[in-house]
């Protein structure tokens, strides 16, 4: 399936790109956002991150006509360190698209999809060691239930965890789906959606990685530089929203002229998240849960 970048125009416009600026695509994926950034650059430069060597290989071909780019195979939690190694200490904009690419979802070796029978893997970085198979076959029932509840908001977390322990070993996605079908019979939506989300987050440590990346991104931004972040699930969106809020407020002493105090680090550009249009939803059903939040560095 061809990968379609979600909220493409809105997220790129939100960066307020300067032709000679330095920009970062923290989630290269299919290269759609990188392509649009490069189209707007003159003497500027793009640094694009992805921990997936396959994604970088595809993007290398797609973006071969542009010389002002650098690909970095790394988890975006190391965005600051990797850029510093290249002598880059400040940038003018950073975009994060936190969704899986269609290539990853449809890649049978990844095991992200609960619609076909794949190996239980779920690693975004194939060089990483922890897999979903290891989790479901080695974690204790309580730990499994905690993960399903915290990362998937799964109502039947304890029941599903117990069934997994009793059914071990599990090797494929549909073996896990058989369990969720029984545990979540009659519930709205696909029975395995929340469990698969929780396992993917645990395998890739997605929330820890995002927290570290957000703090690094704020340090990297020039004054006037922007963060453009697309999320696809509530935990990530809450984290981004909270980060923006925390860094756009300051506790001023009472009865003091706040004009004499420095501004908070961030100014929120999108008071409410930008959502996909009806037209985009018609053309790309995977965009349905997407939310875009934009903020600008001001101090």
From Swiss-Prot:
GO terms for cellular component: cytoplasm. SUPFAM superfamilies: Putative methyltransferase TM0872, insert domain, S-adenosyl-L-methionine-dependent methyltransferases. Its main location: cytoplasm. Keywords: Cytoplasm, Methyltransferase, rRNA processing, S-adenosyl-L-methionine, Transferase. It comes from the Bacteria. Specifically methylates the N4 position of cytidine in position 1402 (C1402) of 16S rRNA. This is Ribosomal RNA small subunit methyltransferase H 1. S-adenosyl-L-methionine binds at residues 31-33, 50, 76, 97, 104. It is found in: Cytoplasm.
